[in-house]
Amino acid sequence: MAHRHFPALLLALVAAPAALPALAQDAASPMPVKVVVVTMFEIGQDTGDRPGEFQNWVERLPLDEPVAFPQGYRDLRLNREKGVLGMVTGIGTARAASSVMALGMDPRFDLSKAYWVVAGIAGADPEDMSLGSAAWAEWVIDGDLSHEIDPREAPGDWPTGYTPLRHAEPYAKPVPENDEGARYRLDPALVSWAYELTRDTELQDADALSELRQRYVNHPEAQKPPMVIKGDNLAASTFWHGKLLNDWANDWVEYWSEGQGNFVTTAMEDTGTLQSLTFLDKAGRVDRDRVLVLRTASNYSMQHEGITAAESLSGEKKGGYSAFIPSLDAAYRVGSKVVLELAGNWDRYADTLPGER
């Protein structure tokens, strides 16, 4: 398929730093990429300081070659020998969608067979997941696309002020067929393969995390040590928190997945990423079936017993992001097993998805 490239993009590439000439001059013969690692934020530099989601990948995989990416949120990183490309999208669905689309249309890369591994931290439903754990999602549901009225003005029998697009009541049936990007289902066989490959991964734990987990006395899953699980993701650009919104998230995921999904993690980007990958798939630029979403628990999505949602969100009674560093570590430990397996056995996975074998 012939690809058109936007003039503005080509101008941006021409203007890329001279320190990175090779990729900028290879548009006529794009570099095949085996795996794209998608992270959402970094705190400072790519290496050597307090880490965000990207730094472990840069230092440990490693992603040792910087690649100018002026049309995106942050420059890319590449391991040329392994064929692995890493990116930071920026926080929120808008930046994620824009950055992924910019990469997908970048003429320097052939992404037609690339696997995409989204690896980031998230809030976790204590009913299903413990701090420091990792969850592979099959369903990714958008938490922004909706109608909304303030629940204080809603009818008394409404459980929420949110209603699905094109419906006038919460959770009205039938579920809209034209969902406008409200739901995405990843390839179930690929997700199961990733889970089976990584389910026995040893994850970081600490006494402070164990102490916090034990405060969730009515949530047995929240009290368990970190582990790898399967669980679905709600993506919304609003950082919400608290029991009532946690109940809404469970109902919203159940509704849009038509009872097949279970809300486990909450993050801010993944429907934006998947929307762009869906469009890029239509253009023949990527394979939408080669996408995995891994989210690790940096905090719980609701308060434990004895404190309010506001206190929990502000961290007034300990907690907050107590699992920040362990969750970053888990995203790399678990995600890298999949990335290295795919990239290291490319003759096996280039033309056949793992779950299809």
Where are these regions (language model features)?
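Bacterial N-terminal signal peptides that target proteins for export
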Residues: 1-9
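Sec/Tat signal peptide C-region and signal peptidase I cleavage site
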Residues: 20-24
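N-terminal signal peptide c-region/cleavage motif recognized by signal peptidases
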Residues: 15-19
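Accessory terminal and edge-of-domain segments that mediate assembly/interaction
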Residues: 25-357
